Regions:
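Nucleotide/pyrophosphate-binding catalytic subdomain
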Residues: 1-147
Length: 147
């Protein structure tokens, strides 16, 4: 349980973070944890303090699990290697599902949210003689859009 003195200590920092943008990155496995709802409540608290939040999620946990369920080998689960077509299709499926679950959780806390295309990326192409297939490289983040 939080003590009143702890709360006072926290509250003195709030004014310096109002209207700021926090980027929170979470692993996909966390979304399925029973305590994920607490993270969503923390995000709701940040929003109530006029702190903007961008939530970025991974999906490798769900990708591995779906591939195993379907008996389909995957070429790249952690985002660092070559991504083939079948792996890309599975990754898109799990990412869309996960985004939907997160949006539902945010909505249940009266938070409005949207999935964006603020990440500008291009195919990695051929690197050191290796065709990276569907693996991409982030060129930039449209941070003006996120603000």
């Amino acid at each position: 349980m939080i003590k009143l003195t702890d709360l006072r200590e926290i509250l003195r920092y709030v004014p310096s973070f109002r209207e700021k943008l926090f980027v929170i990155s979470i692993d996909g496995e966390i979304v399925e944890d029973e305590h994920f709802a607490n993270i969503l409540l923390d995000i709701a608290l940040l929003r109530s303090l006029n702190i903007r939040v961008v939530l970025v999620h991974g999906a490798s946990y769900q990708l591995r699990r779906l591939a195993e369920e379907m008996g389909q080998p995957i070429s790249n689960a952690d985002g660092t290697g070559i991504t083939d077509g079948p792996t890309l299709r599975l990754a898109l499926t799990v990412s869309n599902r996960l985004s939907h679950e997160i949006l539902e959780g945010l909505a249940s806390n009266d938070l409005r949210a949207a999935c964006t295309n603020a990440v500008v990326a291009h195919p990695a192409g051929i690197l050191r003689g290796v065709d990276m297939q569907f693996t991409g490289r982030v060129e930039r983040i449209d941070d003006a859009f996120l603000r």
